[in-house]
Amino acid sequence: MSTAVTEGIEVTVRSTFRPERSEPGRFLFSYTVRIANQGEVPAQLVSRRWIILDASGEREEVVGDGVVGQQPHLEPGEHFEYTSFCVLKTPHGSMRGTYRMVRDDGQAFDATIAPFPLVVPGSLN
């Protein structure tokens, strides 16, 4: 699990290995993200940037609008939660990134997604 707070936006991520959807050389992980506005100003998530690293050092960058087809607008005290998936070629790696947020006054900033592990249980022993 990882948590980061940037300008009142808290991003918490939990990842889970999905053995039923994995096979050798293709390891599927789900991750659940909770984005909470702990600040005093409404803000909208407009885009995302993920950096995915596997155990061999291979790096993939994913950039796009919104998350799961949405651009959630969060009033102070509100949160948004979603689950998505990532496939690695190795049994462990990590993800990190940023969400581009825009406050109602037009000010934009990048909310940090702290690094979190993607690990097949027992693969690091």
Curated annotation (Swiss-Prot):
NCBIfam families: PRK05461.1. This is Protein ApaG. Pfam families: DUF525. Signal peptide: none annotated. SUPFAM superfamilies: ApaG-like (SSF110069). HAMAP family: ApaG (MF_00791). Residues 3-125 form the ApaG domain. It comes from Anaeromyxobacter dehalogenans (strain 2CP-1 / ATCC BAA-258).
